Amino acid sequence: MVKMSHGPRSGSRRKLTKSAEERKRSVIGRFMQEFEPGDRVAIDIEPSVHAGMPYHRFQGYTGVVEGPQGDCYKVAVKIDSLTKYVIASPVHLKKIKG
C-alpha cells in the first residue's frame, strides 16, 4: 500500500480545477487589483497561480481587508466566533460590491 499524501493541496482536486471556459480567460487583470483597508472581498483561488495562494479551506469565504502585507493582502475572515487571518495575493481575491 502507498501512504496517503498529507500535503497542503491534498483533497482539493475539485476546488482547484478550472473548467474549459475558465482556462481560456487571462488572469493578468486580476494581478493588478488594488484594495483598501476595510474593503470586503471574497476568496476565489486561482489554481494556475501558486504564489500567494491561501489554503484551500478558505475557498469561497468572505472577509475584510486589513491592509497590505508585502505584495499580498491580509484578510480577516470570520468563522463562527473566531477571526482568522489569511494572507493572499490579489489574484486570489474578488471585491464585493456594497
Swiss-Prot record:
A GO molecular function held by the record: structural constituent of ribosome
Entry-linked Gene3D superfamilies: Ribosomal protein L21
UniProt-annotated stretches for the region Disordered: 1-24
Keyword Ligase belongs to the record: no
Keywords recorded for this protein, A-Z: Ribonucleoprotein, Ribosomal protein
HAMAP family, per the entry: Ribosomal_eL21
Protein name: Large ribosomal subunit protein eL21
Organism taxonomic ancestry: Archaea, Methanobacteriati, Thermoplasmatota, Thermoplasmata, Thermoplasmatales
Gene (UniProt): rpl21e
